[in-house]
């Protein structure tokens, strides 16, 4: 269990690094005329991700470590982290935990964005399911996955609307390769 708590602390530290990156990138985007969308649902996303970590820690106390499940889930968590940071690196200063669109910038179609429309959310789904299962916290995995599906539905609609608005506001926008 101690190593699992250390894993959760590492994931929490990674989340803090994400928030620092997002804060810096938000300043970059807003300084270039960026507009934020979906501000009202952002606190629910932050709360859900905090609850994921707390739920993992609390439920793992009552669950055994099952090696076949745990090691497989840990590999999925590592893959999800890799995908997430590939997204961050591919978007550069345009990556954010918030939906901020800078008018006049073309859509990014490099890195994982050439394969998936929303690869960062794929990483979130994978991690939200796998991280609890590393230590058999299936109630947390199920609860997070269901609540996350509701939030992602709102979030993806918001992001798609924002990106559509940005494209139609400037019909000359192309794709970054």
Please annotate each region the language model reported.
Residues 1-6:
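Feature marks short, highly hydrophobic, charge-poor N-terminal signal-anchor/signal peptide-like helices
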Residues 8-23:
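N-terminal signal-anchor/start-transfer transmembrane helix
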Residues 9, 43-44, 50, 75, ...:
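A generic secondary-structure signal marking the coil-to-beta-strand transition
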Residues 22-40, 64-177:
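Cytosolic-biased juxtamembrane loops and peripheral soluble domains of multi-pass membrane proteins
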Residues 40-69:
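Long, highly hydrophobic alpha-helical transmembrane signal-anchor segments
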């Amino acid at each position: 269990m101690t190593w699992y708590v250390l894993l959760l602390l590492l994931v929490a530290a990674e989340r803090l690094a994400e928030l620092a990156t997002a804060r810096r990138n938000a300043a970059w985007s807003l300084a270039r005329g960026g507009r934020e969308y979906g501000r009202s649902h952002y606190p629910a996303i932050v709360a859900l991700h905090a609850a994921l970590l707390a739920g993992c820690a609390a439920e793992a106390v009552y669950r055994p470590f099952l090696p076949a499940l745990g090691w497989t889930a840990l590999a999925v968590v590592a893959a999800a982290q890799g995908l997430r940071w590939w997204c961050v690196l591919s978007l550069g200063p345009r990556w954010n935990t918030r939906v901020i669109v800078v008018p006049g910038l073309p859509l990014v179609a490099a890195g994982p964005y050439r394969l998936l429309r929303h690869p960062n959310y794929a990483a979130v789904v994978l991690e939200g399911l796998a991280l609890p299962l590393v230590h058999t916290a299936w109630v947390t995995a199920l609860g997070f996955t269901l609540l996350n599906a509701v939030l992602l539905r709102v979030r993806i609609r918001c992001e798609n609307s924002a990106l559509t608005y940005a494209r139609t506001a400037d019909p000359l926008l192309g794709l970054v390769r």
